Amino acid sequence: MGKLKKFLALNRAKKLLLVEAVVALAKGRVMVWLPFSKVAPSLGFHMKETPLAANAEEARKVRQVARAIALMHRHTPWQTHCLARAFAGMNMLQRRGIESTLYLGTGKDENGKMIAHAWLRSGDIYVTGDDVMDQFTVVATYAKAWKTQEEEIVQHEKG
C-alpha cells in the first residue's frame, strides 16, 4: 500500500496529528534559522527542568506526539535535525498544556570535532533525541512550564 493510501486509511484524529507534526516540524526548522537569542525566551525557564512524573493521560499524549514526530520527520521535503524536532515536540506539547524540558548538549565526534545535540523530555518520556543523548554533556536546559508551575520546578531541582 502506498504512503498516500496508508495516510488516507487513517482515522481523522491520526491524520490531524500527523499534519500537526509536519507543521510543527516546519516551524521548528524556521526557529533553528533564527538567532538563538530571539528564540530562547520562548523556550521556558533557563537551566531548570520539569518533574519526571506525569499522569497516565498526559503520558499517552506525549507518546502520540513522540511517534508523530518520529514518523513525519522522515517524510518532510527538508532535513529536520535534532533541534528542530525538539522545538516541534515542545510546540505540540505546549498546545496540549503539557510541560517539557529541552536539553542542549555538546560532545565530540570520532574525529574529536565538537558536535551538538538537542533532545526533549516530558515526564519520564523522551520525546525526541534520546537515541544518542548519552554521548553528550548537557550544557543547557529549558523547562517549558506555566508560570504557576515555577515553584514546582524549583522544588524538583532540590528534591
Predicted regions located by residue number:
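Helix-boundary/low-complexity linker signature
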Residues: 1-159
